Amino acid sequence: METYSHAFFTWALAKHGVKAGRAAGIAGAAGATVPDLPSFAGTAYYVGTAYLWEGWSSMHSEELLDEIYFHGPFGATGSALHSAMPVVALLLVYWVFGLGRRDRRRILLWFLLGWFGHTIADFLTHVDDTRPLLWPIWDWEWSSPVSYYNRLYYGREFFIVSHGLMLLIISWLLLKRIVGQKRRRTLLPDRSVKRPPA
């Protein structure tokens, strides 16, 4: 999935789904971006500002894409962050040491859940750009039958469904806010009407 999709769905789930709060929603969205940070840094390092003007066409070779996403310092770090092992280890530390007692607003928990959710979603939506899910313990990779971008593997359909769902959630949240504001106005006394003196 696109990085912004990971962040949006985690934010929506944390803040509006399970009602963990605003801070948890922001932390979840931040955690959901963590696995892709090395690819952003690699793109900035290898391609620079050309990416801003030319987009994907600025990445003119497979070797360049491999350096950004799979090899070298950026690719290796990205593979480590896309593995479930580091985040599962941190979730175990959170649970074993009872960090939930100190994390009352669940900020750290949602950060880790956002990261974990990104890892699982990418595992399920990557076909030809897979990473080992259990690295460094096991180098096994799975090629999903569905791609988040490749049209040969339902990428267009996935894009329509995921972005349609984001649009639906945004519309629902806006409608909920508008209805809530109207209700508050009807429940509050109108202060503009002057009452006659008693």
Segments from the language model and where they lie:
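N-terminal membrane-targeting hydrophobic helices
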Residues: 1-198
